[in-house]
A protein has these predicted regions:
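A general structural motif
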Residues: 2, 38-40, 71, 119, ...
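Conserved, mostly hydrophobic/aromatic
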Residues: 5, 74, 246
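Short acidic, glycine/serine/threonine-rich loops at helix termini
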Residues: 15-19, 55-57, 85-90, 134-137
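Charged helix-capping and loop-helix junction motifs
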Residues: 23-25, 58-59, 261-265
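Conserved C-terminal portion of the radical SAM core fold
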Residues: 30-87, 97-127
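Short secondary-structure subsegments characteristic of cysteine-rich extracellular domains
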Residues: 87-104, 112, 260-276
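Radical SAM enzyme core and accessory elements
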Residues: 133-293
């Protein structure tokens, strides 16, 4: 499978400045060598307004596209600013206007690449669409969700899976009675509410409360669910009506262990909230199965 490369920009001087590393400007040479060796890559770009966006972003994508087919795709995610920024460069975050401008820019480039390369090549994470209050791409336009782990098309994929899977369920589970809750970050909150509605429409006796959790640990501008900590879950859910089970995304925990980013374990979270907590994969079928079992 392709290796993931954090690109951010292919402008050598700008990359040295952004990464604060005097060797960071040699990225394109390295990627060319990898391509010549037949190694396949996916590129990630964390976009920072006023630094590597607009013209710089176009330059970066053109450089990366020149390495097709070895560079499969480029994922673009908006910068998130934590509250730990003493002595660091001043950064802005995307707002509705700047996110919308970025969507327009990428749509134009996608059309061009589709014509020239047979692929849209550059994909924005769902966060851009949420910030800009604009619709996501259609399911097929994500071309197999090459950068799903970077949050590119995650909402479209999960939403489609939930709707399609619910149509196929016709068994004893439909009579199940239970009350449960879901905890999620700000960016996925609206989607999770819609998903809960879909499930409750099909399962008349299941009640789901969705709770939006603010990221006080890293800072409020960090809105993705995967960066929420157990501390924030405990602080914001401790006196809430959670029903019999709380569901969270598995991505809140470290890859191979049930520990949150603040080093609290899943078991400790369950003890503090006095409730069973079930992590779900970012897959529609897994979420529905776990909630309705």
């Amino acid at each position: 499978s392709p290796i993931n490369i954090s690109v951010h920009t292919t402008n050598p001087e700008l990359r040295r400045k952004m990464i604060n590393n005097k060797f960071a400007g040699k990225l394109m040479d390295t990627m060319r060598r990898l391509a010549e060796a037949g190694i396949e890559m996916n590129a990630q770009i964390v976009l920072c307004p006023g630094y590597n966006d607009k013209k710089e972003l176009e330059r970066t994508l053109e450089d990366l596209a020149s390495l097709r087919p070895y560079v499969h795709s480029a994922a673009i995610v908006p910068v998130g600013i934590t509250r730990y920024r003493d002595n660091l460069a001043k950064l802005e975050i995307f707002d509705e206007k700047s996110a919308s401008e970025t969507i327009d820019q990428i749509h134009k480039l996608q059309e061009k690449y589709l014509e020239e390369l047979g692929t849209r090549f550059a994909f924005l994470s769902d966060e851009f669409h949420i910030i800009a209050k604009r619709p996501l791409l259609k399911y097929d336009e994500y071309e197999g969700f090459l950068q799903f782990e970077d949050g590119v098309g995650m909402i479209r994929k999960m939403g489609t899976e939930v709707v399609e899977y619910l149509k196929t369920i016709n068994d004893d589970r439909l009579n199940k009675t239970k009350k449960v809750s879901i905890a999620t970050g700000k960016s996925a909150y609206e989607f999770m509410c819609n998903m809960a509605e879909e499930i409750m429409t099909k399962f008349k006796n299941i009640e789901i409360n969705v709770y939006r959790i603010k990221n006080n640990f890293f800072g409020e501008t960090i809105t993705v669910s995967g960066l929420l900590t157990a501390t924030d879950l405990i602080d914001q859910l401790k006196n809430k009506d959670l029903g019999e089970t709380l569901y969270i995304t598995r991505s809140m925990m470290k890859a191979d262990e049930e520990i949150f980013l603040d080093n609290i374990t899943l078991k400790e979270l369950e003890e503090k909230l006095n409730i069973e907590v079930i992590p779900c994969q970012n897959e529609g079928i897994d979420v529905v199965d776990k909630i309705t079992k």
